[in-house]
Amino acid sequence: MTMSSKAADYSSFWALGDLAVFKQMMKAFSPSLRYFACSIVGNEAEAEEVVADVFIKIWQQRAQVTPPDNVQYYLFKAVKNTALNYLKQNGRRQTHLAAWEVEVSHHHAQNPEDILINKEQLDHIQAAIQSLPPRCRQIFILVKEEGFSYEQAATLLDLSKATVNVQMTIALKKIWAALGPTLKYSYS
């Protein structure tokens, strides 16, 4: 089940105020929301606080809020706004993106050497993503990791779709350039 299809299941929370559905929604979205918040505030502890604040506010105001058409978009927009307000209140500007967490490869290596090579490739990918400029990295995370369309990412970040397109092109070119020497091609 994709994040978007999960989001559709949770829209009923607003109509019913069901605590069990709310808890499921928190469990489903919290990891990606924390990761996104961390890309704005710069560390995991503050990101956790931002996401918790968003969910607390949603629970407290559930009766007054019109159910959103797109729960995933609504949550990411709320986290973005809360994180930016958090930075303003604490007198800080956006500093850097947190470490990119690469999920464990689904490729099952057959020997220790393959495991080491896969780990090294993941480390190179992580380093390449970390080397992106902050805005470029944020867009890359939304589009490639969270599955947002270019248009959704543009709306969420208050940018034009063309800007998102340009930033994604830059991100992909920089990542491929950084990874070029480390990629193994096995065409026989």
Language model regions located:
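C-terminal edge and immediately downstream basic/flexible tail or linker adjoining helix-turn-helix-like DNA-binding
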Residues: T2-S4, S12-F13, Q94-L97, T155-L156, ...
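Sigma70-family region 2
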Residues: A15, F55-N70, Q89-G91
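Structural recognition of an alpha-helix C-terminal capping motif at a helix-to-coil junction
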Residues: Y35, E49-I56, D69-N81
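Amphipathic, Lys/Arg- and hydrophobic-enriched alpha-helical face
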Residues: M26-E44, Q61, I129
